[in-house]
Amino acid sequence: MKLKIAFLQLLPVGSLKENMEKGIKACFQAKEKGADIAIFPEMWSCGYIFPHEEASLRECAVSCYGSFVKRFAELAAELDMAIAITFLEQHEPKPRNTVCLFDRHGKMRYCYSKVHICDFGEEDDESVLDAGDDFFVTELDTKEGVIKVGSMICYDREFPESARVMMLKGAELLLVPNACPMELNRLAQLWGRAYEIMLAIATCNYPAPHPDCNGHSTLFDGVVYLPELPDSRDTCVFEAGEGEGVYVAELDVDMLREYRHREVWGCKNRRPEVYGIISERNHI
């Protein structure tokens, strides 16, 4: 099985309505390019630009059952293509940073909210938002077959536990909406993460010149060794440039599954009985 993943590396337009319309157009372009899954960058509803005053923040947020999100559910069914739509979600006591994954039938497979919010003690950080409290993995039905998918959002990448938890829940592919500079070290994180837990990671970022973003959406397939190769291979099978665009990359799921069955990374030699300190707080 091979899946085509569309990275909607787009510049937001401004208003919710304009972003919705531009997102719809991009999804049609993704379908024209043969995509099975389309992923947006982080918090597409507002372009990851949100007010910090409480009343304005609440006004900016949208419901996961409201017209903005519902339109992309309908579009997923219309296009026979899974869509991972991102938005500032209405929630109590505070809004959340959320991605909803709809399958090709328009059914919501999960609604995941960012677990590790960017609370850096800065005026423009995410301290005004609520954090999510779990990671989800679902069986996503595509026209090519079923694949187990989960999501993490931007800063979640910085914590190895995020991807590890979803690997232990059976994930084969992680969809990662993003809004930050994807420079050498952050890209290296993804290289390492895909290698150490043997899964694919698809990250969609905003293009330049969006504030503090530089494109470089990527797909890592997680397959480091092949029997016919004398040495390791590069797991980065796609990297966009800085510019805006709808980019499509292919993931060889059968190759990944065969590799996971053959190799020893990931789960095989884990010893969770000695990892207890990992789930405790503030040891540094």
Language-model segments: residues:
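Cys-nucleophile CN-hydrolase/nitrilase-fold catalytic domain and related Cys-dependent amidase chemistry
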Residues: L16, K25-H105, R109-C111, C180-I197
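Extreme N-terminal starter segment of soluble prokaryotic enzymes
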Residues: M1-A6
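A short, polar/charged loop-to-alpha-helix boundary motif
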Residues: K114-V128, G243-Y259
